[in-house]
Amino acid sequence: PYNVGLDSAILMNPQVWVASGHVTTFNDPLIDCKSCKMRHRADKLIEGWLAENPMPDVNVEAMTNDEMVAFIRAQQIPCPGCGKSDFTDIRKFNLMFKTHQGVTEDTAAEVYLRPETAQGIFVNFKNIQRTTRRKIPFGVCQIGKSFRNEITPGNFIFRIREFEQMELEFFCEPDTDLEWFDYWRSFCHEWLKGLNMHDENLRLRDHEKEELSFYSKATTDFEYLFPFGWGELWGVADRTNYDLSQHQKFSGQDMDYFDQEKNEHYIPYVIEPSLGCDRVALACLLYTSDAADD
């Protein structure tokens, strides 16, 4: 009863991605091997090495770019391609696919393929709330294609450049966000267990303060034990009112909500469960294959 559906645009005004922070912050740490010229994601290079050389106190996701470079050099982590340990410094690689609209290829005509479905929900928040007459709390959900220019796609359909994503943006009162975060965290866990994913192959990992995204108050990742190691299936995040506030700032459009019962205005907080459909399908294929073998 709380939620409604949406099918938002894949190509949106490029200022949407400026407001959301994707143009400046949606980056992966790219590092090159000087010997064989192979390119790697620095964090994945370290994680691959740690899988064979466990160091429980090391949290890769909390590392800065400088810390990752220092760790790679201190541990003499080898290049998977040539075995040598001679890497460049890290440089930022933006994950958004860029294209051009119209007949001229100048910067004024640049647009992006959406890297997530969430922003299409945020920019339509007021339109949806008014037309559906929904009262807070309520959610807007959609399933659709997202696109990311991954540095190192691989592991079959786990990391690909075009993928199917399911996201729910659940809007709530600011003081109730952590309660709803716990609710959706529990809901997602039960949903995955309903697919017969066994607890020994499924874990919940709460982000430490140092690794939280800049917009997040709390985040939990649901990770599955794939043959290549633990990988994220689903993330649940408390995005606070960051996104709506940013779009209000950049667009000049009012994004607040008037609570008639309390006679007050506020910008809603958002709880976001974000699921990669392809990854869940891969996990299901793997554990059903294991069951058949047994």
Give the label of every model feature segment.
Residues L282-L286:
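Short active-site loop/helix that positions an aromatic residue
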Residues C277-R279:
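Conformational gate/switch positions in structured elements
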Residues Y287-D294:
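Conserved small/polar residues in nucleotide/adenosyl-binding loops
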Residues P1-L275:
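Cys/His-rich finger/ribbon microdomains and the adjacent scaffold used
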